Amino acid sequence: MRIPLLCFGAMMALFFVGNALCASSPYPVVKPDPQAVAVATKWLSAVDAGNYAEAFTMFPARIRSAGDAMETQWVGYQRAKRTPLGWTLSRKLVKAWFTRTLPGSPDGYYEFFHYNTSFQRKTQAAESVTLTKESGHWQVSGYRFR
C-alpha cells in the first residue's frame, strides 16, 4: 500500500510541476507537434466522456506500473473534481511549449498544452495537458484544470 501511495505522490508531483509550467512557462512557445495534439485530443475525449479508467490506460507505462491502487486513486480524484464540471462545451488550444528537461523527471521530450475551456458548470476554465514522448510515441503524463 505504501508503494502505490508514494507512486501516486510522484505522479501528482509530475502533474503539478509539469502543468504549472504551462501556466507561466519559461520555455519558448512552439507550434505544437500534430501527433502530440492528436494524442491529447483523444485523451481529453476520454476524460470528457467520463472514461477515466480508459484515460489512465493511455498514461506511460512508468505511471501505469504503479498498479491498481494508483488507477483507483486517479479515477476517484477525477470523479470527485472533474465530473462536477459537467459537459465540455468548448476547448481551444491557446499555448504550447516544448522542453527536454523537467524538474523531478528524466530528460526527454515534453510538450505542454494550455487550453481555454468552457464546461457546463464552469464557463471559464483552464486546462493543462503534459505529454511525454517515450519510445517514439507521445503519451499524456499530466493533466490539470482550474
What does each model-identified segment do?
Residues 8-16:
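Bacterial N-terminal signal peptides
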Residues 52-53, 137:
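Internal amphipathic alpha-helical segments of the cytochrome P450 catalytic fold
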Residues 37-38, 45, 53-109:
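Short solvent-exposed beta->alpha transition segments
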Residues 4, 18-49:
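Short, low-complexity N-terminal intrinsically disordered segments enriched in polar/charged residues
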Residues 31-35, 58, 126:
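A general secondary-structure boundary signal
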Residues 94-146:
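Exposed beta-sheet edge and beta->alpha loop/turn motif
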Residues 1-8:
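Bacterial N-terminal signal peptides that target proteins for export
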